[in-house]
């Protein structure tokens, strides 16, 4: 905490913490979600295991806050205080309809979490070591109630921005199919690496049909392209996390260097074309997930007869095309037109 903290360092630490916390909490569901559902149907006594995924998804705020504290080299008490405030403000835990208990509702609002985590971090930096002897009894309640309370109060406002953005995107649904799918794929490729939740936008505009399919393909293109671009400079686990978990792990990096989205946007546009040509479908509930948990491919296959041909088509459009176009555009912008460098994709996590 004695190091000089610049605005850039502060912003990057907060965004990196939110990004890493999001991915860590979503990866269990992405890898095991469908498997645990299947196990629960075969062995009802093990159905409770699916609850672990629901809880993990709801803990993004807590995990992100603690990770942000680690990035700032805070003490455990300070880090957990940020986590508690961020979890409370994010809205993933809400009262039951009869107000007698609590229930989990999704993963919470990422924008609200960023705001609250930044506020809580600034609060702890302001206090510094003044409360050192009483930190255990002062910091957690003050940060949770005051900072978390402010964050929770702003939750409806930040959630409303998602709806406003959704209303703007909704106008695209009246365009010609190929133009529609290209734009939707590119927009969702951007949304998934932004503080805005792509799933929330998809639900807000009730996106379905080929528009939903294009949204998922855009996210697939984003995940695979970022993994390919960072293959030489990041660990293999981090690369895989981009499409198995969420591309949001690169959110802070993209905010710092927006130009690294060039290959992603081009790859998403190509995938969007194939969404229209091959009639790739989806639903409002599936749009926004992409390849994570195989939600996108499974949602499309649910609209087909499930034949071997349809399975092959899904594999081509959800994996082969994003990977091939990702390789092409990464090489284009790093070798042929050297606008970006592989080092630009390095994540310091």
Spans of model-derived segments:
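Pore-lining transmembrane helices
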Residues: 1-349
């Amino acid at each position: 905490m004695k190091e000089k903290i610049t605005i850039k360092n502060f912003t990057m630490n907060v965004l990196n913490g939110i990004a890493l916390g999001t991915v860590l909490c979503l990866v269990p569901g992405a890898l095991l979600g469908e498997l645990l559902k299947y196990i629960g149907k075969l062995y009802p006594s093990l159905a409770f295991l699916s609850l672990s995924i629901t809880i993990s998804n709801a803990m993004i705020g807590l995990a992100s806050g603690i990770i942000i504290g680690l990035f700032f080299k805070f003490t455990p008490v300070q880090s957990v205080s940020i986590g508690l405030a961020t979890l409370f403000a994010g809205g993933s835990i809400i009262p039951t309809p009869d107000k007698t208990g609590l229930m989990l509702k999704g993963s919470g609002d990422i924008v609200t979490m960023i705001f609250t985590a930044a506020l809580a971090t600034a609060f702890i930096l302001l206090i510094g070591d003044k409360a050192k002897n009483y930190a255990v009894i002062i910091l957690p309640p003050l940060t949770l109630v005051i900072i978390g309370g402010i964050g929770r109060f702003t939750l409806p406002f930040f959630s409303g921005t998602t709806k406003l953005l959704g209303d703007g995107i909704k106008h695209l649904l009246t365009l010609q199919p190929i133009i529609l799918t290209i734009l939707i794929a590119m927009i969702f490729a951007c949304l998934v690496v932004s503080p805005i939740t792509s799933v929330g936008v998809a639900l807000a505009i009730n996106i379905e049909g080929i528009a939903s399919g294009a949204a998922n393909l855009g996210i697939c293109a984003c995940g695979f392209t970022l993994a390919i671009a960072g293959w030489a400079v990041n660990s293999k686990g981090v690369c895989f996390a981009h499409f198995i978990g969420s591309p949001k792990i690169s959110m802070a990096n993209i905010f710092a260097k927006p130009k690294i989205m060039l290959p992603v946007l081009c790859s998403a546009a190509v995938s969007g074309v194939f969404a229209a040509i091959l009639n790739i479908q989806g639903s409002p509930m599936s749009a926004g997930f992409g390849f994570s948990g195989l939600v996108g491919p499974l949602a499309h296959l649910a609209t087909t007869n499930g034949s071997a041909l349809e399975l092959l088509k899904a594999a081509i459009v959800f994996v082969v095309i994003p990977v091939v176009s990702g390789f092409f555009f990464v090489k284009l912008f790093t070798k042929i037109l050297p606008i970006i460098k592989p080092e630009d994709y390095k994540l310091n996590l």
